[in-house]
Structure formats: C-alpha cells, structure tokens
Amino acid sequence: PRIEDVAIAKGKIIDRGQDLNYTNAEKVIDAKGLWLMPGLFDIHTHYDLELEVAPALPESVRHGTTSVVIANCSLGLAFGSQRDGINDPIVSCYARVENIPKSVLKNCADNVDWENPKDYLNHLDTLKLGPNVVVLLPHSMLRIEVMGFDDSVTRDPTDIELEKMCNILQHSLGIGYVGLSTDALPFHYLAAHPHCEKTIPTQFAKYRELKKLTKVLRDKNAVWQATPPKDSVIDTLKTFLLTSARVHGKALKTTVVSALD
C-alpha cells in the first residue's frame, strides 16, 4: 500500500502522487486513514433469489464488491418459474443445493412473471441493483426448458433438443449473457418427489452434450463456469480437455471450482 493523492476526472484516474495540487479541483475528499482500492469482482455467487428481495445486496457491497456473477452451478431464473403443473423446478433445484426453505423458494417462484432469458434481463433492469450484475445461462434450467423437468433427469436429449439448446445459448449470448454454467458436484440433489434421489439436471449431460454447448461458447468467446466431477479422475480430465486450445483449435474461457474439500 501507498499513501498518496489521486486525481480523478470524468471517472478516470489522471494523476497520482504525493501532495498533488488540488487548487482547481471541484471536490476534495479527505480519505486519511482509509483505503482506496478497485471494486471487487465476485465471479461465483448464488444471489439469483436474493436479488428479488434485496437487490441492493448490501452485505456484498459493504465489503467492496462492485460486480457479481449470478446463475452459477447451472441454477438460475433465466427461464422463469418453469412450473409445469406438477414440478416446481426452482423449489426442487435450489432447496438442497442452497439450503433454502421450500416455503421461501415457493414464494419467490410465485412472484416470477417472466418466461425467457430476454425478459429476465429486462426484469433485472427494473431492480434497484447495488452492484453490477453479470448473468450466466444456467444449464440445469436450459435442460428443463428444452426437455421438460422429468425427462431432464431421466434421459439424454435428442439431436433436435440438443440443437435447440445450442440455439438458445447462442441467442442468449447475443443479448447479454456472458456464458453457460454447469455443475458436477455429487452432493447437489433435487428436493422433490419422485426425484429426491437424483442430482440436478446438468449432471445428466454426457460428454457429447457438453462438447456441443462449449463449442458455442468457444465460438462466441464466452465463459464456461463449471465444477468438476470430483469422484472421477477420468471425467475430470475429460472436463478440462474441453477447455484445451490444442485439441479444439481455440482456448475456452473457463472458471472452474478446482479446489474441493
């Protein structure tokens, strides 16, 4: 750390040093005893639901965070509640993964009034957000949207369904989403019958599906957020192989939770 003056004009630092001349400055802030630092960028959060009740995210901002990434680990609200009359995906997917009471999740789902990725971004624009919010497209919800909840955890997608997933991802990247989030942690289970013994939909995706989706990301210079299948060395290696520039001709921007307890 250094003790010095900082001159700012039009939102940019134009000078810094000891005892700057501030005679013509419009405003002088005495920051003696305080720290001046860049805003923190929190790249892995699960604030999707919290934004709906406390969009200012004061507990995050007060620590110096100015930007957050949401919809990590394949879970998010990009497609709305996705209720089908029987299944309640927000409740089932979030309850055990995020340890949130089902009653709270149900109330959140009741208040969702959008049904697609574009309308979700428009919804976020109506909130009085504290930090900047960056959104990933959640893979579990993408599978549910294309295949239906029950099928998303019982079978592979057809060629047509996989192509539709790729098209939705490509469109979403074009309107402001920065990437795709997936998950492979073995303790992320669903919370509603008859699927309580099954993990969230993203974990049913085979290598072929992930390869197709990550190709879209690579072509668009977008980001793949992932957690590796920690119980399988082979599957973990295959996961990281998808990021290889040598194999695929171009590097893939990736953020991976690689250190696990």
Model features per residue range: what roles?
Residues K118-L129, T154-D261:
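Histidine/acidic residue-rich metal-binding segments in metalloenzymes
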Residues A7, D42, V69, N132-L136, ...:
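Structured core elements
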Residues V53-G179, L217:
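Divalent-metal coordination cores built from histidine and acidic residues
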Residues T23-E26, K32, L36-P38, H63-T66, ...:
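Short coil/turn connectors at secondary-structure junctions
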Residues L34-L57:
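Di-metal (Zn2+ and/or Mg2+/Mn2+) metal-binding site signature of metallo-dependent hydrolases
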Residues I29, Q82-C93, P194-T199, F240-L242:
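Short low-complexity, flexible loop/linker segments enriched in glycine and/or proline
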Residues H46-L49, C73-G76, K230-D231, L260:
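Acidic, glycine-rich active-site loops and adjacent beta-strand->loop/helix elements
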Residues P1-G39:
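Histidine-rich, glycine-flanked metal-binding segment
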